[in-house]
C-alpha cells in the first residue's frame, strides 16, 4: 500500500517496486497526503501506471505484470487487506525493527507494506491499522522520504525472505 505521492515519485516507486518483485500496488489516500488524486483523472492515471508496470516487468524479465489497483481511502485499505503479514513503516517506532519482525514470521506467504505520505501516518490511522493486525516497524534511526522508505523496506523484505541476494 502506497500513499498518494507526487506524480513522478509514484511512477518511480511503481517502476522500482516491480523491479524488486512486488505483486501488486494499492495506492492509499491518507490524512497527511499532500497530493490528492482527482477522481476524474483516476482512470487515466491507472492506465499510465499500468503501462509503467508493464515496462518494468518486461525490463526485469517478469512473466506476470503486477497489478496497480485504484486508490482507496486509508480506512478501507487497512480493513480489507488479507495479507498474512501486514507491516506499517512508522517513523517513531522504536521497538519493532523490520528485520526482527520478518524473522519472527518466516512462514508468511504474503506481506503487505504500508508506507505513509510525506506528513507521516496520523495517530488515527496508526490506531486503525493496529486494530486490524498491522505491525508497526522501524526502518532505522532516520526519517526517510516516502519513495526512499518504500524501496528500502522492499529491498529489506526481499533480502530477509531470500528473494534478493540470498
Residue ranges of predicted features:
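Short, hinge-like loop/turn segments at secondary-structure boundaries
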Residues: 42-46, 104, 155-156
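RNA substrate-binding interface of SAM-dependent RNA methyltransferases
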Residues: 1-87
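A short acidic, often aromatic-flanked loop/helix-cap motif at beta-alpha or helix-coil junctions
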Residues: 72-78, 94-96, 144
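Residue-level recognition of oxygen-bearing side chains
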Residues: 9, 73, 120, 148-149
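Active-site/ligand-binding-proximal alpha/beta "capping" segment
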Residues: 84-120, 125-126, 134-137
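Structured adenosyl-cofactor binding patch, chiefly the S-adenosyl-L-methionine
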Residues: 123-166
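Glycine- and other small-residue-rich loops at beta-strand/loop junctions that grip anionic moieties
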Residues: 3, 118, 142, 146
Amino acid at each position: 500500500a502506497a500513499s498518494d505521492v507526487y506524480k513522478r515519485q509514484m511512477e518511480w516507486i511503481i517502476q522500482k517496486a516491480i523491479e524488486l518483485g512486488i505483486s501488486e500496488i494499492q495506492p492509499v489516500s491518507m490524512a497527511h497526503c499532500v497530493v490528492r488524486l482527482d477522481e476524474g483523472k483516476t482512470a487515466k492515471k491507472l492506465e499510465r501506471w499500468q503501462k509503467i508496470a508493464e515496462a518494468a516487468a518486461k525490463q526485469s524479465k517478469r512473466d506476470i505484470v503486477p497489478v496497480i489497483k485504484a486508490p482507496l481511502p486509508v480506512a478501507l485499505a487497512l480493513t480489507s487487506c488479507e495479507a498474512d503479514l501486514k507491516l506499517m513503516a512508522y517513523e517513531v517506532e522504536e521497538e519493532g525493527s523490520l528485520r526482527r519482525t520478518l524473522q519472527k514470521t518466516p512462514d508468511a506467504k504474503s506481506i503487505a507494506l504500508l508506507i505513509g505520505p510525506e506528513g507521516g501516518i496520523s495517530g488515527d490511522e496508526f490506531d486503525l491499522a493496529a486494530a486490524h493486525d498491522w505491525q508497526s516497524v522501524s526502518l532505522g534511526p532516520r526519517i526517510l522520504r516516502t519513495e526512499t522508505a518504500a524501496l528500502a523496506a522492499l529491498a529489506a523484505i526481499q533480502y530477509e525472505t531470500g528473494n534478493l541476494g540470498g
